[in-house]
């Protein structure tokens, strides 16, 4: 079994997570859905930190050869960047899958 790398959320990912949880818990009045999403996100992050290359490599004109990967979490996508030198995984964004992904990736900030 591979060693587990450290995981961190960028400021953008933290803001995304806050927005998603608020939307699910408050706007949809479904705190159970918010808790379930948080659990699924935690599991996806743990998997990414244990197996950094487990997510699909993102092929996009705005991210040429960057090594950014993604994992699907229900209706959402978690974009992350493994750093083998530092043995860290940086979660860059967590976004609703039906958003304009090109626009998200264009300004992902790596």
Whereabouts are the PLM-identified features?
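Enriched for short, Lys/Arg-rich terminal
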Residues: 73-77, 81-110
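Short capping/connector residues at structural and topological boundaries
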Residues: 6, 68, 106-109
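Residue-level recognition of specific faces of alpha-helices
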Residues: 16, 40, 44-47, 70
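Aromatic side chains
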Residues: 5, 23, 37, 51, ...
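Basic/aromatic recognition patch in beta-strand/loop cores that engages polyanionic ligands
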Residues: 50-85
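Hydrophobic recognition helices of helix-based DNA-binding modules
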Residues: 20, 24, 45-48, 52
């Amino acid at each position: 079994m591979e060693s587990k790398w450290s995981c961190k959320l960028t400021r953008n990912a933290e803001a995304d997570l806050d927005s998603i949880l608020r939307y699910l818990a408050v706007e949809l009045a479904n705190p159970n859905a918010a808790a379930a999403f948080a659990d699924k996100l935690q599991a996806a992050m743990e998997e990414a930190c244990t197996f950094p290359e487990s997510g699909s490599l993102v092929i996009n004109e705005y991210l040429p050869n960057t090594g950014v990967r993604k994992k699907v979490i229900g209706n959402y996508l978690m974009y992350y960047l493994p750093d083998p030198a530092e043995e860290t995984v940086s979660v860059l964004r967590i976004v609703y899958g039906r958003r304009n992904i090109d626009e998200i990736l264009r300004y992902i900030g790596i």
